[in-house]
Amino acid sequence: MSIQVLSEKIRALNSDWPDRWVSLRDVFKSCHERLGIAVPFDQRTSRLLAGGLSVSNFVEHSCKNMARKNKEPGYHSRLHTAIVLESLTALLLEQRQIDKLNTQSLIREEILLLVAMAGHDAGHDGSRNSSICQLESRSFRLIRPLLEAAKCDERDIYAIKRIIWSTDPTLYEKLHNGARTTDFDLIKPSWQAVLCQEADILASAIPEFEKQLTLSLADERSKVYPISAEGLLSPGGRKYFLTHYAKFSSPAAR
């Protein structure tokens, strides 16, 4: 994967945030167009794409409302979601090259992943899970009506829920271990989850961005979890992240 190209995208997003910010909908649209998905090929895929545009628009405006009240999280913000979408796009493009696929082979699966990650932190208020998939479940509940309004296929809605739930960090190790028992295939739910997990934390594993992202997360947590925030900034905090969360199993990420 071209870390250089992805880094340029992340730098551009950082430079625009927040004063020259475009919108998450524009980032989502740019990502699916770079994947060559400008015109979907069937009704199911078209509806999925419409759902993704609606989800990204919803997250943009709900976060903007939070920002007006000075309540948008410092880390789990629109900027984070945009970086995740760019990271996922980079991984998908790299995987295409590895698999020698044309742009039409897995269009629905690729859009499915983009839609899931556009909404994976919907409604995030900077808190942490007190039970497994607590915040992830809330995010899905917020975006489900939008997917239903776009008449997305129930199979796709279920898959989006599954992917969003898989972004609970406590599930990373189990899901990566399970996926590694099979060959990579984007059609497989386990590998869909892994690729999205990788996109969620990829930027934090790039040395150029690790410090600022860690500071943003620590600042977000300091308001409610000061001890956790201190741990992130401690010498062992980075090591813990690399050991427990920075897992990269897909061919595209290795």
Question: What would you call each of these model-derived segments?
Answer:
Residues 1-41, 75, 87-107, 119, ...:
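Divalent metal-dependent phosphate-bond-processing catalytic cores, especially two-metal-ion Mg2+/Mn2+ enzymes
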Residues 56-87, 123-127:
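Active-site flanking loop/helix segments enriched in acidic
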Residues 84, 110-127, 139, 162-170:
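His-Asp-centered metal-binding catalytic motifs of divalent-metal-dependent phosphohydrolases/nucleases
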Residues 101, 127-130, 147-154:
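Short helix-to-loop capping/linker segments positioned immediately adjacent to catalytic or ligand/cofactor-binding
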Residues 81, 88, 136-178, 236-237, ...:
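Histidine- and acidic-residue-rich, metal-dependent catalytic cores
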Residues 37-67:
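Short alpha-helical hairpin
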